[in-house]
Amino acid sequence: MGGDFRHFSSHVSLLLLFLLIVKSSSSFTPADNYLIDCGSSDETKLSDGRNFKSDQQSVAFLQTDEDIKTSVDSIPITDSNASTLPLYLTARIFAGKSTYSFYISRPGRHWIRLHFYPLNHPLYNLTNSVFSVTTDTTVLLHDFSAGDTSSIVFKEYLIYAAEKLSLYFKPHKGSTAFINAVEIVSVPDELVPDSASSVPQAPDFKGLSSFSLEILHRINIGGDLISPKIDPLSRTWLSDKPYNTFPEGSRNVTVDPSTITYPDGGATALIAPNPVYATAEEMADAQTSQPNFNLSWRMSVDFGHDYFIRLHFCDIVSKSLNDLIFNVFINKLSAISALDLSSLTSALGTAYYADFVLNASTITNGSILVQVGPTPNLQSGKPNAILNGLEIMKLNNAAGSLDGLFGVDGKYKGPIGGMSSKKLAIAGIGFVMALTAFLGVVVLLVRWQRRPKDWQKQNSFSSWLLPLHASHSSYISSKGGSTSRRMSIFGSKKSKSNGFSSFFSNQGLGRYFPFTELQTATQNFDENAVCGVGGFGKVYIGEIDGGTQVAIKRGSQSSEQGINEFQTEIQMLSKLRHRHLVSLIGFCDENKEMILVYEYMSNGPLRDHLYGSKENDPNPIPTLSWKQRLEICIGSARGLHYLHTGAAQGIIHRDVKTTNILLDENLVAKVSDFGLSKDAPMDEGHVSTAVKGSFGYLDPEYFRRQQLTDKSDVYSFGVVLFEVLCARPVINPQLPREQVNLAEYAMNLHRKGMLEKIIDPKIVGTISKGSLRKFVEAAEKCLAEYGVDRPGMGDVLWNLEYALQLQEASAQVDLSEDKTTMNIEMDLIPGEEMQSPSHSIP
């Protein structure tokens, strides 16, 4: 930095001049500065002043089996950052694993900037290229594809490098990889701190220096694009126009960049150049006494990561000190209360920045919302708020990845720990299951042909075989008597409507309950009658019709999320009737209420029977036998199988877990809580949707791709199966790290032949080995890493029924051997010789 000063006679003069240059310009000369225009034959000089070495000059850095390059004269791209477009006219192509290796002269953080554009090549279609890019410690891109030729792809990272930094390009099987340009550049130490404020507010987040970062958004608020030529670290700052959610409420403010000052020990031009601090957005009606909105910017991000967020402020709107005080919010959570810039900088027009780490749990809709707004009830100053710039960077996850759940070794590092699929085995199993399903359909057809004439009265087919569409059901008067079609029930009650009357009336929900009847049924909604609480409100036990117990779900008007899920549950249950789905009896919407009435499940959720009893409970819940557990799993599988295949349009439950499997007085299992359910697509394999569900049960592929299929329910059910077997929570953070996630821990032990180590000790010695083997086999298939490798619920049901047959057969044999351990062979009748259960739509 500062040039060669050896001709100065005094070392003191050298030091003074050096400090002067640093102070005045905050210039930075990187110790490592590798700029490569891949595939080019000549050096490329950009208009921003940077020189990229040609491919020939950089060949020493590359190790690859084949020398494949391509180039064009021009590309059909008009980009606002035109200075880098020459880099996309050439490319290196890799048919196999290839490596760029760079020697690092000064260890520390480095930029890794990657440029992609799929050029034409006579032998390779780069638009179809799929590949991964990693360093020795971090996955930068996993199964990446640049897509079509409509836009360039630029990726930017901050990675720690020691003596050598290697970039590995790994094409997907049968594909290629490519790269147009690579930048490896040293970064000032002060650019990223080791700690930052936490959001939600908590002790500071520490240890940032150990994380790799991907820069997702770098935005110049209130101004135009800032090119690398202006930024001392060659960064690009984009305009905030695409991100401003309410531009009508904001006003651009601009001052001369030369008037911006940097405080001692605070922000420098290396943190952000002065053009960033010289522009801002303020509130358009800042002169009003109480503006009733916030300035807001929304940026898309990925799920499953924490985010480093840097906000840039500079008071360029006030006429005097202490005239601007405002609040800062990130994802509607308080980040800074009553921010007074002048008290922090002691001057106007002075740069200031604040750093935060946003917890991954706060990201519910795939975006980050940054807001600033005036502090209410100001004693002095004018109600106003500003923001000058913002940066959002993704932190690597526990897999050491910035893109997905695979580690640098290519192994899956998600919730179940990298199981590999065996295609031939899956194909064989699939064939057998398909054949079994076909035979089941034949059996159904034969039964249909042989049905008795009075089949409707005798009910040869159970009423739950086919869906009962509520739009064709009858209204049963709450006073009893004959039924009559209820065409409209709201015409005379408009004054009492809660705003959802039209929604309810179109659903044909059956029995209508007056509010007074439900008050009586619950003793005026007595708190002692509460048997459950959720986002929708409370569930009460009540009695109707002279003693019939029911569950009464009373929606809370204060919860928007609960109301949305409440409506979804109405829509779903109005379509469905099945022995293994909780039945909807009726509803009430008087007095601004939203109340649903269900059949009462006296034995509560399955989870309570597995590990719900408290220690030293005087009335503990009896332990479920292995046979009972199998029957409960079979019933639940039947309910889910019906959801997926039995309705006119398949339904994906999306929240399968043991608290949503309820048991009646006979321990018959019924699936409940359809608040998160989605209709399956009619013509596509998945539904693109925001990720929802319960931690520990969530399908990692759904989490990763945000594409919901019925196989997501299958994954969750696989977790349930292990929960039933082991009788412990699916997530227990108090256990050692390798034991926290039940599904992952169980699969690891199963692969080692040590699964008996965590089986519920209350049933150890009662499970036949064949039954256990078939049960665990079903659970393992459900937890396959890719949905395409998981069985359907019908096939899972078949395996569970088979496991039950094996258990029953074993129980009939008088064993002379000791049955106290799981290591003793308990199946005198081999599983292979058992008669397979006939399979049909349950």
Curated annotation (Swiss-Prot):
EC number: 2.7.11.-
Cellular component, GO, one term: plant-type vacuole membrane
Enzyme superclass (EC): transferase
Signal sequence, renumbered to the chain: 1-27
Top-level division of the source organism's lineage: Eukaryota
One record GO biological process: regulation of calcium ion transport
Domain Protein kinase as annotated: residue spans: 525-803
Annotated SMART domains: S_TKc
Topology in the lipid bilayer: Single-pass type I membrane protein
InterPro entries hit by this protein: ANXUR1/2-like, Kinase-like_dom_sf, Malectin-like_Carb-bd_dom, Prot_kinase_dom, Ser-Thr/Tyr_kinase_cat_dom, Ser/Thr_kinase_AS
Transmembrane spans: 426-446
Location relative to the cell: Membrane
Extracellular membrane side: 28-425
Keywords: ATP-binding, Glycoprotein, Kinase, Membrane, Nucleotide-binding, Serine/threonine-protein kinase, Signal, Transferase, Transmembrane, Transmembrane helix
Sugar-bearing residue positions: N81, N125, N252, N294, N359, N365
Residue numbers on the Cytoplasmic membrane side: 447-842
GO molecular function, one term: protein serine/threonine kinase activity
Binding site for ATP: C531, G532, V533, G534, G535, F536, G537, K538, V539, K553
Active site (record annotation): D655 (proton acceptor)
Family to which the UniProt record says this protein belongs: Belongs to the protein kinase superfamily. Ser/Thr protein kinase family.
Protein's UniProt name: Probable receptor-like protein kinase At5g61350
